[in-house]
Amino acid sequence: MSNCYSKDTCVFLKKEDLSLLDQNLYKEELSRNQLIELIKELKTNPFGRRHMISFWNWSNMNKKALVECAFETIWNIRKKNNEYYLDMCLIQRSGDMLTASGAGGINESQYAALLMMIAKVTHYKPGIFTHFVANEQIYDRHIDAAKEMLQRVDKSQNQNIKICITTEIDDFFQLTIDDFEIKNYKPQTPQLKLDLGI
């Protein structure tokens, strides 16, 4: 797992090393690790109302080729039948339905995995994943692929697909892709190739 998702999320530097960062970035924000603070707060103040991570950083937006599409998560603990669940809401400003933000796209997959990872290390059950996309689109160049996908839908082929974390590792930063297992997934062929839009 990479040590940093983006400079806007967290920086693994000591305060005295912040001078190594790009001078144009807002250093006070970056000196706090939102991910570590989220995990700590979920453990020590589970029903707090400030469990959030935000990638939105006005100070360096004009320096990026693409500003974050999926830019904020909100986390809540919910008690049901004497068990505690970690729910997450992902907020996305814009999304390419077929490649990123639609059902099973990379945004949903990666954030579902993140929910599972944080639930594991905070000792809650993974709860409800809510995904809000303000501007969902299908690009013209993907129309034929979208039609093909609609023809391929076969609910009997992929029933009860599950993604599981298979390790007992309890440290978020030690988890890797090898600690995940996908069960009951049967990919359809041929694989559709879709260009990403930037």
Predicted regions and their residues:
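Terminal, non-catalytic protein-protein interaction segments that mediate quaternary/complex assembly
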Residues: 1-198
